[in-house]
A protein has these predicted regions:
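Alpha-helical tetratricopeptide repeat
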Residues: 1-128
Length: 128
């Protein structure tokens, strides 16, 4: 039986996205994460990994310098997983690259408070 977006289990789409992301094929990864997101929106977002679909798609957007597209995904991922410091750190990078230094510094400080050491480097370098 062929898989279509309406009957494909979400996890394979997510893991295929991860494979593409690890191969630096960000456009294909974005497409797979987008399908996983579409499926989750249709069938419920209570599955524990849904935040990661948004986080990973946002990370891919960040890698291809489509930072303005990454910010809403990082923000939604934080809605689903509000104590994830890595999401704050990466959204901070996206904010900084889009000229929103105040928001970037706020996110980096939050990430630092959640144990992300690299965020402290950003705070020291860019938030004086």
């Amino acid at each position: 039986r062929a898989f279509t977006p309406s009957n494909t289990p979400v996890s394979p789409l997510y893991y295929l996205g991860n494979i593409y992301q690890n191969e630096n094929n960000f456009q294909k990864a974005i497409a797979e994460y987008s399908l996983a997101i579409k499926y989750a929106q249709k069938n419920g977002e209570d599955f524990g990994l849904v935040y990661a679909y948004y986080q990973n798609r946002a990370s891919c957007y960040l890698k291809i310098n489509e930072c303005s597209k990454s910010i809403p995904d990082f923000t939604y991922a934080l809605k689903l997983n509000p104590d994830n410091g890595a999401i704050y750190a990466n959204r901070g990078i996206a904010y900084y690259k889009t000229g929103k230094k105040t928001e970037a510094c706020k996110d980096w400080r939050k990430a630092q408070s959640l144990g992300i050491q690299s965020a402290g480097t950003y705070v020291r370098r860019y938030c004086r």
